[in-house]
Amino acid sequence: TIQYFFSEVIAMFKNLGLQLYSIRDYMKDPEMADFAFERVAKMGYTEAQTAGNAFDAELFGKLLTKHGIKIVGTHYDYGEIINNPEKTMEIHRMWGTTNVGIGGMPGEARGSLANLNEFIDKFNKVSEIYAKNGFKLTYHNHNFEFVRIDAFKTLMDVMYEKFNPDTISFVLDTCWVAAGGADVCAWIEKLAGRIDILHLKDITVVNENGRITPRMTEIGNGNLEWNRILKTAEETGVKHYVVEQDGFFLDGNNPFASLKASADYLKPFIK
């Protein structure tokens, strides 16, 4: 039984997306991917954000199209984005998306403010190449971006201030914002007009031998206020709503029961 912890459910968006990292174990070859795409399409997922592709990119895209799923963005290799923009744009054109993304910054970029600024400068510079060709770079956060990089500002604050808003958008992840101790709706409002893709991921806490531990979970099974989050997202111009669950599935290592639970919870919000 799905429970809604508010009095009224209001339809907010037209299409439900899936970050394919959620089904990464099924992305290893065309047969497994075909099977997985068919299953999630039947659950109501009509959009996807990629997380790499282990086989031919053209076939990968065709399999998604076969099941009525449109690619709306990617998490792509950072080195390829920086060093091989022409090939990267060619693949994204073939996939039919203008959102070229990374799942996070290189590890060394978090080490110091100087390193962070170097990463931002490089990402800003290459984003201009993509923008001239009709693309936009995207950045997906985790919780470490909410660590204070100096006495006053978090990494997220610095990126908010220094990323070029005309050429780079944020893929804001609801779970990781909350796990970073920040206010999800406040960040959606702060980034108004700069979030094309919102990652829908719930968070709960579990008791592990007396230790209270945060854990991602199915939409509606955690502690986030989805009515408020989705209303704020709609009001601020979010274009794509993409479910992601990295792990901790209802059925062991099988993600499908969890993805169906999230899709079922979100169906009343779909126009």
Model-identified regions with their sequence ranges:
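Short beta-strand and adjacent tight-turn residues that come in two discontinuous sequence segments
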Residues: 50, 74, 102, 243
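Active-site acidic/histidine proton-transfer and metal-coordination neighborhood
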Residues: 38-42, 47, 58, 70, ...
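Residue-level recognition of beta-strand->loop/alpha-helix junctions
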Residues: 22, 49-52, 75, 141
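The substrate-binding groove and active-site-proximal loops of carbohydrate-active enzymes
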Residues: 75-77, 106-113, 175, 216-220
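Glycine-rich, proline-tolerant flexible connector loops at the mouths of alpha/beta enzymes
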Residues: 45-65
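Histidine-acidic metal/acid-base catalytic patches
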Residues: 3-42, 54, 65, 93-96, ...
